[in-house]
Amino acid sequence: MKVKCTVSYDGTHFKGYQVQPGQRTVQTEIESALAKMHKQDELVPIVASGRTDSGVHAKGQVIHFDTPLSIPMERWPFALNSLLPDDIRVLKAEEVDESFHARFSVVSKEYRYKVSTETHQNVFTRQYACHFPYRLDADKMREAAGYLIGTHDFTSFCAANTEVQDKVREIYTLEWKNVSDGLEMRVRGNGFLYNMVRIIAGTLLEVGSGKFHPDEIKAMLAARNREAAGKTAPSHGLYLWEVFYDN
């Protein structure tokens, strides 16, 4: 039986999602919990929609795994959560067809990036939003965001050391919302390159602060050079919000 789970986690104290020897990761914790449920020494392998970096959070990460256990679907979250640390929670479990793949069946993803513009950093949210206490022109940020919507080569907006050859992606929506303590960027697309969302966020923050003009985004895209775009925003403001599949 193949099980699909929606998982939420606070990335603060993890060295990212993916297994790393000697490090605390989300994947390791979930696979360890599954091993206990299956009463075996070996980890039960899971597959995720994608990896997240150290410090990045997830509201709706999706994983799948195969199991011989005949536990009712509604009991899986309770069973797993009883074995998981408090900074990981399984929100939902459902049986899926054998053809489903948490990574390769993805149609689109939504990420959110939270920015606190308060004068003094809020000690209670310092790990969950990027603190940017400078004057921001949100209208210019929204104008610049418009140039990124659509299908583009995002070479300038991904880590220079990425091994991915095809850097063409499509962004469906990209908007900045006013929230109680600042701004929130919401972006949905068919796929994202390594550090792409954080580089977009960092660049648009620099547009808002006046370092770049909104229409300079067009030249950044055309340059296809990481050095043409702005800074990479800190990881702790980023959330994998939702993963979308057909049906």
Curated annotation (Swiss-Prot):
Catalytic activity as recorded in UniProt: uridine(38/39/40) in tRNA = pseudouridine(38/39/40) in tRNA
Q: Where is the active site?
A: D53 (nucleophile)
- The EC number(s) attached to this protein equal 5.4.99.12
Keyword flag Transcription regulation: no
Q: Which Pfam families match?
A: PseudoU_synth_1
Q: Which UniProt keywords apply?
A: Isomerase, tRNA processing
Q: Which residues bind substrate?
A: Y111
One annotated GO molecular function is:
tRNA pseudouridine(38-40) synthase activity
Q: Which Gene3D superfamilies match?
A: Pseudouridine synthase I, catalytic domain, C-terminal subdomain (3.30.70.660), Pseudouridine synthase I, catalytic domain, N-terminal subdomain (3.30.70.580)
Enzyme class name: isomerase
Example GO BP: tRNA pseudouridine synthesis
Question: Does the record carry Isomerase as a key word?
Answer: yes
HAMAP family xrefs: TruA (MF_00171)
User: What is the protein's known function?
Assistant: Formation of pseudouridine at positions 38, 39 and 40 in the anticodon stem and loop of transfer RNAs.
Q: How does it assemble?
A: Homodimer.
The UniProt entry, under NCBIfam families, shows: hisT_truA (TIGR00071)
**Similarity remark:** Belongs to the tRNA pseudouridine synthase TruA family.
Entry protein name: tRNA pseudouridine synthase A
